[in-house]
């Protein structure tokens, strides 16, 4: 299979699977964090509290993506980090993280 010369190679990630540290800088609890706390819900009691530590290592991650020659990156935001109480009061530190 051949790709056109203008094909854009990229990568994508999910906030819960990569960021870790959900309560850092005032972040709230997501549905996944609550689910993972339920006994027996997840094998071995695993959770995303550290994940890939993208919260602290995002600059290194960006360098790695660039070194792979990727020209696009799609990431998701953690609404629990942006609106920790689910009441529309934005967490400025959460917004700054994604800016």
Question: For each predicted feature, which ranges?
Answer:
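Non-catalytic accessory regions flanking glycosidase/transglycosidase catalytic cores in CAZymes
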Residues: 1-99
């Amino acid at each position: 299979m051949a790709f056109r010369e203008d094909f854009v190679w990229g990568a994508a990630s999910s906030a819960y699977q990569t960021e870790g540290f959900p309560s850092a800088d005032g972040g709230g609890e997501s549905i996944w964090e609550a689910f993972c706390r339920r006994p027996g819900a997840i094998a071995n009691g695993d959770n995303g509290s550290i994940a890939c530590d993208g919260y602290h290592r995002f600059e290194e991650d960006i360098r790695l993506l660039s070194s792979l020659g990727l020209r696009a990156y799609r990431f998701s935001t953690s609404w629990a980090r942006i609106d920790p109480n689910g009441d529309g009061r934005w967490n400025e530190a959460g917004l700054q993280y994604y800016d």
